[in-house]
Amino acid sequence: MEIRTPNRLPFHRWAVFPVLLAQFVVLLLATLVLWQWKGSVSGYSGLCGGLIAWLPNVYFAWKAFRFSGARAAQAIVKSFYAGEAGKMILTAVLFALTFAGVKPLAPLAVFGVFVLTLLVSWFAPLLMNKRLSRP
């Protein structure tokens, strides 16, 4: 059996694009607020925290939404598991690199913007254009 793969949609046409865009906007706004009120160290620390949350989500979206169609059910499940595993590994690596390589660092800003960026996912159903209809 052949697995159908659709033509690659542009990034802005993905179903998850509004969520990723909202996360990116939130991380930029939080970074600008921190930079303005707490200084440059908190600003770039917040940027690091936001990117630690956002980049793995982009990776997951890229990895998980590659297949479509009923014939590709196994490939879809495998790609979701692989995407989630890669997301966790990437998050751990980015945290390690940030705390090992970025000096000086404001840990509260890193974790604060990280959590704030992840909170956008809780409101993802409000950001999605397509409504699921019940038969």
UniProtKB/Swiss-Prot annotation:
Q: Does the keyword Cell membrane apply?
A: yes
What keywords is this UniProt entry annotated with?
Cell inner membrane, Cell membrane, CF(0), Hydrogen ion transport, Ion transport, Membrane, Transmembrane, Transmembrane helix, Transport
- InterPro entries documented for this protein: ATP_synth_I
What family is reported?
A: Belongs to the bacterial AtpI family.
Q: Which domain of life is it from?
A: Bacteria
Membrane topology note: Multi-pass membrane protein
Q: List the protein's name.
A: ATP synthase protein I
A single GO cellular-component term on record:
proton-transporting ATP synthase complex
- The transmembrane segments are 14-34, 41-61, 82-102, 108-128
